[in-house]
Amino acid sequence: MIGLDTNVLVRFLVQDDPDQAAAAAALVTDLTEAEPGFVCREALVELVWVLERAYGLSRADISQAIDGLLEARELVVEIADRVAVAVDRYRKGGPGFADQMIALAGLGAGCRAT
């Protein structure tokens, strides 16, 4: 297993720089269920921020991208169940993705409120 950082995820999803997109695609397409890529929660939070701020993507488009990462059998997404809930709430509006993740972390830790 190898870890995928935010830059690889952005380049793979956005395809805005041909050379970097090709390098990211080569890395991602070599992943398998037996040798998956790991996506940590911090990379996902940063990915959403970059897609919103730098690329101006909509919540719907970003949510669809995160759904694709969650569904990919050649990826292991850290706390995927929590990410799925956070992205569903994010898609519907209200607080941003990072805030959704923070609220769910609090719930998971037994906090009464966050």
Language-model features: locations:
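Active-site neighborhoods of divalent-metal-dependent phosphate/nucleic-acid chemistry enzymes
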Residues: 74-114
